[in-house]
């Protein structure tokens, strides 16, 4: 096991994708992954309650544009100093670029890294927010 005691919850709202994910998790995961299928607005509050504080959250924001602000706000209620968020598809549309700007401006966010196809967000108070980092390939 890579991380003994690791607790991982994955949420998927499309049953067909959940079936594929379940197979992949069973083959590759060294720790059991709690895969929950259904509406994010119903699943997320309970998942966050079960987790307490979150260490890492991956947002598949391309397909959930209508829920991005809500998902982000709910998850930020459960951060700690070492929490990291990763957002997929931050440049895929004007709406996503605007959402990414909102994330970068959030008062709890200390550092952001823009990798064009995804964005990484840190909440660590030891990191000083001098600017947002943009990486060009």
Regions found by a protein language model. Give the residues of each.
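S-adenosylmethionine/decaboxylated-SAM
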Residues: 1-137
């Amino acid at each position: 096991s890579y991380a003994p005691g690791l607790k991982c919850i994955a949420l998927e709202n499309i049953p067909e994708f959940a079936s594929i994910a379940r197979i992949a998790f069973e083959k590759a995961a060294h720790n059991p992954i709690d895969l929950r299928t259904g509406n994010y607005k119903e699943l997320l509050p309970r998942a966050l309650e079960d987790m307490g504080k979150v260490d890492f959250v991956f947002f598949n924001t391309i397909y959930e544009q209508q829920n991005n602000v809500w998902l982000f706000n709910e998850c930020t209620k459960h951060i700690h100093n070492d929490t990291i968020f990763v957002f997929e598809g931050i440049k895929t549309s004007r709406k996503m670029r605007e959402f990414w700007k909102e994330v970068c401006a959030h008062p709890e966010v200390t550092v952001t890294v823009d990798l064009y196809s995804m964005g990484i967000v840190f909440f660590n108070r030891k990191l000083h927010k001098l600017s947002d980092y943009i990486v060009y390939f």
